[in-house]
């Protein structure tokens, strides 16, 4: 797991939870061993904390969910991989002179199946975020992903992708290196692969940066994750010329897992631990591993032709609407 000494930034709506967690931790630190009175008091605080977390998390707005998944303690791809896979090794480079740290990948095993994994990788502290470009891949990152996916297709290995990015890097250099072309080629090629592809949105799924590794037979989305064509801030700036309208933009964009399940964009919503995946990395990883194995076993029953046809039809249905 990647660690950082940086003190986490707590969103306003999470402050009551953070304060109560601090009180519980302090009580545990100061409590003498085998003091039943103190133990009972700690248990009451713990029950109160759990109840408060359930109340807050049951009524999160879309914008609050976005702020939640942007927390530095949220598990990243490289936090999940050691807990999900039985063995793994990271592979590097696009064989064109680049090795983008904002997008990682490699090979591994899960439940006896050899797989290729690919995922966006954010940092935690400022230094690490700068090194990983805040999880925004350059063209070389998408070309590295394509190289690994072609390797998977050649050797008959299922592909697992983990989506967590505000978007692809939009700098001048990225455009000069063919950002749009790199993402477009990935989209085209992912429709042609003859192996199962399972995509999991673990945090923030933003725009083409997410789609560049987001074409799959099964799309899993963590309960509090978000998936959107543009960030609410960017949408507000474009439509209202005012980023303060991001709350309205977040509502209109339908970025939550439940909205996207209703619209047929995602297939499965994965329940997160109380307090979100950032509160319990181990439990979040356990839930995700179980779901990945389940989806993998379903998809491995299909032949190559069935996989490609179902994948194509799945995405062709997206965007359908009904007039009332």
Curated annotation (Swiss-Prot):
Transmembrane segments: none annotated. Residues 44-298 form the CoA carboxyltransferase C-terminal domain. One of its GO terms (cellular component) is acetyl-CoA carboxylase complex. Its EC number is 2.1.3.15. It holds the Pfam family ACCA. Signal peptide: none annotated. It is an enzyme of class 2 (transferase). It catalyses: N(6)-carboxybiotinyl-L-lysyl-[protein] + acetyl-CoA = N(6)-biotinyl-L-lysyl-[protein] + malonyl-CoA. The keyword Glycoprotein does not apply. One of its GO terms (biological process) is fatty acid biosynthetic process. SUPFAM superfamilies: ClpP/crotonase. One of its GO terms (molecular function) is acetyl-CoA carboxylase activity. Gene3D superfamilies: 2-enoyl-CoA Hydratase, Chain A, domain 1. Pathway: Lipid metabolism; malonyl-CoA biosynthesis; malonyl-CoA from acetyl-CoA: step 1/1. Its main location: plastid. It is found in: Plastid, Chloroplast. Component of the acetyl coenzyme A carboxylase (ACC) complex. First, biotin carboxylase catalyzes the carboxylation of biotin on its carrier protein (BCCP) and then the CO(2) group is transferred by the carboxyltransferase to acetyl-CoA to form malonyl-CoA. Acetyl-CoA carboxylase is a heterohexamer composed of biotin carboxyl carrier protein (accB), biotin carboxylase (accC) and two subunits each of ACCase subunit alpha (accA) and ACCase subunit beta (accD). This is Acetyl-coenzyme A carboxylase carboxyl transferase subunit alpha.
């Amino acid at each position: 797991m990647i660690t950082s000494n940086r003190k986490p930034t707590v969103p306003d709506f999470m402050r009551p939870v953070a304060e109560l967690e601090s009180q519980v931790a302090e009580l545990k630190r100061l409590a003498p061993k085998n003091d039943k009175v103190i133990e009972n008091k700690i248990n009451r605080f713990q029950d109160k904390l759990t109840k408060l977390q359930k109340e807050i998390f049951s009524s999160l707005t879309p914008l609050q969910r976005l702020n939640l998944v942007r927390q530095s303690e949220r598990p990243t791809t490289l936090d999940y991989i050691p807990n999900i896979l039985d063995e793994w090794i990271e592979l590097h480079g696009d064989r064109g002179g680049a090795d983008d740290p904002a997008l990682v990948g490699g090979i591994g095993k899960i439940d006896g199946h050899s797989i290729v994994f690919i995922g966006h990788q954010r940092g935690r502290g400022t230094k690490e975020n700068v090194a990983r470009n805040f999880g925004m891949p350059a063209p070389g990152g998408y070309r590295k992903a394509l190289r690994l996916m072609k390797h998977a297709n050649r050797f008959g290995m299922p592909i697992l992708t983990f989506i967590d990015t505000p978007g692809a890097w939009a700098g001048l250099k990225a455009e000069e290196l063919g950002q749009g072309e790199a993402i477009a080629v990935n989209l085209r090629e992912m429709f042609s692969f003859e192996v199962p592809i399972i995509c999991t949105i673990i945090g923030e799924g933003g725009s083409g940066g997410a789609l560049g590794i987001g074409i799959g037979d099964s799309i899993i989305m963590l309960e509090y994750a978000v998936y959107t064509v543009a960030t609410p801030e960017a949408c507000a700036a474009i439509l209202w010329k005012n980023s303060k309208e991001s709350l309205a933009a977040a509502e209109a964009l339908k970025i939550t897992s439940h909205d996207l399940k209703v619209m047929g964009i995602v297939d499965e919503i994965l329940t997160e631990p109380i307090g979100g995946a950032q509160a319990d990395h181990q439990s979040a990883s356990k839930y995700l591993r179980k779901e990945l194995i389940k989806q993998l076993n379903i998809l491995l029953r299909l032949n190559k032709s069935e996989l490609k046809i179902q994948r194509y039809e799945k995405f062709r249905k997206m965007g359908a609407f009904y007039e009332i």
